[in-house]
């Protein structure tokens, strides 16, 4: 039973047995490319089963967070693992779980950190997949952080989510990256989601 996708009106495309829905468009992000990344990340993590990914807006993620976690706030990424005895995907493969990503927060983080939004979506997808595999950064004494850093390097991604949250620093060189324009003086900063 895939409750996460109740919010989705149109199912777009199944890529490599992973359902990717871009409910909110992000420049340069395509469903098939994200589906291929999810497959690579799932294999790198050692997770078996289909992973469905929803890229949506902050309001939808906040609604999911409230409905399933009783947290009435938005966040960047949510993971919904499926127990081994429950759901199967549409192709009959075991469903490992589902990941919901806030495109709004991903865009803010990407801008603040000086890398493309597509990379930020991938970082959040990797973080969600690690949670589906049973990692829990709140209780594992750094195990998830180490694994995420290792996989981030292997998958050629910038600083992993946990590394950013714990360091809370961005080098001046990254802030002035040519990938993103400099902020205008007085521009408001993005909210941090810890």
Predicted segments with their positions:
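An acidic/histidine-cluster motif and surrounding catalytic segment
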Residues: 2-121, 130-194
């Amino acid at each position: 039973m895939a409750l996460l996708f109740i919010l989705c009106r149109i199912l777009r495309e199944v890529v490599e047995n992973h359902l990717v829905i871009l409910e909110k468009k992000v420049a340069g992000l395509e469903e098939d490319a994200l589906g291929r990344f999810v497959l690579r990340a799932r294999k790198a993590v050692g997770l078996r089963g289909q992973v469905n990914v929803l890229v949506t807006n902050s309001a939808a993620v906040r609604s999911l967070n409230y409905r399933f976690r009783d947290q009435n706030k938005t966040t960047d990424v949510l993971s919904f693992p499926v127990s081994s005895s429950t759901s199967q995907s549409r192709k009959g493969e075991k469903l490992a779980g589902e990941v919901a990503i806030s495109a709004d927060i991903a865009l803010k983080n990407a801008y603040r950190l000086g890398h493309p939004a597509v990379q930020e979506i991938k970082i959040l997808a990797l973080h969600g997949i690690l949670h589906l595999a049973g990692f829990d950064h709140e209780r594992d004494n750094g195990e998830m952080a180490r694994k995420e850093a290792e996989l981030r390097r292997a998958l050629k991604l910038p600083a992993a989510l946990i590394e950013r949250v714990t360091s809370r620093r961005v080098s001046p060189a990254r802030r002035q990256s040519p990938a993103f324009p400099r902020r205008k003086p007085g521009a408001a900063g993005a909210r941090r989601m810890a």
